[in-house]
Amino acid sequence: MGRAVGIDLGTTNSVVSVLEGGEPVVIANSEGSRTTPSVVAFAKNGEVLVGQSAKNQAVTNVDRTIRSVKRHIGTDWSVAIDDKNYTAQEISARILMKLKRDAEAYLGEEVTDAVITVPAYFEDSQRQATKEAGQIAGLNVLRIVNEPTAAALAYGLEKGEQEQTILVFDLGGGTFDVSLLEIGDGVVEVRATSGDNELGGDDWDQRIVDWLVEKFQSSHGIDLTKDKMALQRLREAAEKAKIELSASQNANINLPYITVDADKNPLFLDENLSRAEFQRITQDLLDRTKTPFNQVIKDAGISVSEIDHVVLVGGSTRMPAVTDLVKELTGGREPNKGVNPDEVVAVGAALQAGVLRGEVKDVLLLDVTPLSLGIETKGGVMTKLIERNTTIPTKRSETFTTAEDNQPSVQIQVFQGEREIASANKLLGSFELGGIAPAPRGVPQIEVTFDIDANGIVHVTAKDKGTGKENTITIQDGSGLSQEEIDRMIKDAEAHAEEDKKRREEQEIRNNAESLVYQTHKFVEENDGKISEELKGKVEEAAKGVEETLKGEDIDAIKTAVDKLNTESQEMGRAIYEAEAAAGATQADAGAEGAADDNVVDAEVVDEDVSEEKKDGDK
């Protein structure tokens, strides 16, 4: 049986954690970092890059680099690369595959299962799509868990048995959640949750980009948004400036050769952004966090003074303005500083994986559905069957009837949201229940049952009590993927994994070959007088052979040429060693003859005295 991990699949960065001896450990990736950028790039040579390597080449490969894909999950978004369309699930799966690979390299065994976290305010389609991404990556998704709940689990279990109320303020790269939880005696219960799926650190970055674009246009009359490479450089500079402003009062943004003017003269961008100005241009974004906060306090039916701990989650909470606002909203309470906002969610996910696998005992996680669920009834009204903040898993039934005489069927339209008019909410899916016996309106009894599983995924059943006819739907319409499509993507991902592995190995062979040729040329140059012309010619010919094979695609030919060069290089090394050994013997003889010279002996004595003085001085 393979291992289970906890994964925080973030908009900007992702993290993977595992239980080792019952304790959660955050796993460093192959580059040595504990966070992996959620960036995927398709290099022009066909290689798929994920993480830091993808982020590093974004400026020169703008159209083939995808970032912040989490903002598109659960929609019909796709991106075309080399005449192939990739869905948000497939791009997310690439990130998950890297995390899985890195975890397997660390553990030395296969990773089969995962708990993946999502923002608490994610809708059904977004949860379903996240689960599909895990399946495409070759993972059995044990559970989809809300990020604030995972954070509270990681934070709360260290606090012992005492019951306490925890507020989790989670501002990530692309989403915002605030949740209120009660923890005590091994039970983590969510009281209320609210949020904004379109608010995150990316929006703060974009404000800096807009500010820079405006400044540059007023100075030079050139709109940098028309230049994709310049825009990518601005995005990267904006992110760095935002991070810098969390620690200092000013950030200098200097981008040489950002573009050229009409006469092809290079233009530079050089601006200073103060923290005060940054807070001014992003104030409305900050204000948007207040409504969900107040909603949660109201839904939970508590006062701010009853909150025991405040936990900040997500890298964006490092911004001083965010910390100050949270203190203000919670009546001056200092947020907990003992939690790493980038890692705490993955740690909680690993703990939940341990709970589900039976490795962690006496822990019960009671999550809630973030939005109300219901169906459209006569007049376009939203009739709610399950109210928001209901603990899941849950099941609710309600009986409806027909609106017309002799109505043969009913159309069940399932919505998620808080608006009173159904069409103003999110349509999750629809299905038809036919075969209703002819009867006056109001007579047939149609029982509609909503069943939400522990992942927050919705199943709806409609049953005619008179005929016993029944129809069921598992809401999948939002993700837009059938099981056949998911299976195809899984096979595609597996094929690509093998292909990527082969391509990586081939690239390593090429890199090693290039390095060997360079080192050989350098070695020949440095030891020019110590090797015969015949041997030198053989080595140079072998090096040329490697260079020629590198121009082609035949990897076996490169290996053969490298083996030949290694053989000739060893011969050259042996010849140089023998030449130096012979020269050393000659010098030793000369040294013995000169040992009788008194002047030389005096010089040695002086050197020894000096070094002894130095030693004494050092002491």
From Swiss-Prot:
PROSITE patterns: HSP70_1, HSP70_2, HSP70_3
Family: Belongs to the heat shock protein 70 family.
Keyword entries, A-Z: ATP-binding, Chaperone, Nucleotide-binding, Phosphoprotein, Stress response
Comp. bias (Low complexity): 582-594
Domain of life: Bacteria
Chain segments carrying region Disordered: 582-619
CDD domains recorded: ASKHA_NBD_HSP70_DnaK-like
Residues modified as Phosphothreonine: T175
GO molecular function: ATP binding; ATP-dependent protein folding chaperone; unfolded protein binding
Protein name (database record): Chaperone protein DnaK
Composition bias, Acidic residues: 595-611
Taxonomic lineage: Bacteria, Bacillati, Actinomycetota, Actinomycetes, Mycobacteriales
Annotated organism of origin: Corynebacterium efficiens (strain DSM 44549 / YS-314 / AJ 12310 / JCM 11189 / NBRC 100395)
PANTHER family reported for this sequence: HEAT SHOCK PROTEIN 70KDA
Function: Acts as a chaperone.
Any Pfam family hit: HSP70
InterPro entries noted in UniProt: ATPase_NBD, Chaperone_DnaK, Heat_shock_70_CS, HSP70_C_sf, HSP70_peptide-bd_sf, Hsp_70_fam
Stimuli inducing this protein: By stress conditions e.g. heat shock.
Signal peptide residues on this chain, from the entry's feature table: none
